[in-house]
Curated annotation (Swiss-Prot):
Belongs to the RecA family. It comes from the Bacteria. GO terms for cellular component: cytosol. One of its GO terms (biological process) is DNA repair. It is found in: Cytoplasm. Keywords: ATP-binding, Cytoplasm, DNA damage, DNA recombination, DNA repair, DNA-binding, Nucleotide-binding, SOS response. This is Protein RecA. The keyword Transmembrane does not apply. It holds the Pfam family RecA. The gene is recA. HAMAP family: RecA.
Amino acid sequence: MDENQKKSLELAIKQIDKAFGKGTLIRLGDKEVIPVETISTGSLGLDLALGVGGLPRGRVIEIYGPESSGKTTLTLHAIAEAQKAGGVCAFIDAEHALDVKYAKEIGVDTDNLLVSQPDFGEQALEILETVIRSGAVDLVVVDSVAALTPKVEIDGDMDDQQVGVQARLMSKALRKVTGLLSKMNCTVIFINQIRMKIGMTGYGSPETTTGGNALKFYSSVRLDIRRIATLKQGENSIGNRVKVKVVKNKVAAPFKQAEFDIMFGEGISKTGELVDYGVKLDIVDKAGAWFSYGDSKIGQGRENSKVFLKDNPEVAREIENKILESMGVNDELITSGTDDSDDISGLDD
């Protein structure tokens, strides 16, 4: 590049900075690469599967799955973790179904949670944009895309055909907010539902998500959550075993998976993950039904081991740090509490 070209380029950069703000156009070599900031999901295994220690800040996230698979529970845990780190969170409850009592049990500070229950889709997305523009909110959850009903559909008759209105609404909203999210360092999580494709034949998945294709493209991370087992204690169901697959990941390698327990009335079982990953990585020793850490036995069976870790948070944190170190993740990237529920005897060996 000759001197005239360099001067022209510098002038162009100055004009762009003046018009749109300093730092709008930069040379990558002029600025140190900053590690991705994250919000923990509340699940150690899922944070590891995401590759960066949690959900990336300033991005669009989609969490989808069948009914009662744990979608809302996962987002409530993310809210709780963001609040623990001093963040402000908002919950746009388009389904009008937020269980405040359950949110409290999971660890959400409901007194300081911003909640909106919009009447129609346009209102919900206007609220979303306004909240993001404020620059004061760290995490927004929209529950759910399927419930973002366009106003024209609400005002119309039952037999009116409104083809593609919701998809166009979502596409317009995402075009407007995606750039804002990065600028304001705010993360938005869209909860979505699954539908079956009509007339699907041949190869490919018969499932699809609602709201058109825009959300698939704009999302930096897409998580597919499925219930794979019901956890029982005797005859009583006390939780679900779920599997989360990272279907799309723009900040790390995709297609990794994590499994964990969601206990009714408690949420994600943290100490259960510590036992599982501890054994998998040879940090916790397992001999028969007994689990031990170092020279000390921590319990007979998985349930008793979880109770021990719950009662001894310093040991739990030590095991967690060793797991993170073994997996090559900086423990500062993942910050979460050690509160947890008792597990079930049905999972004991």
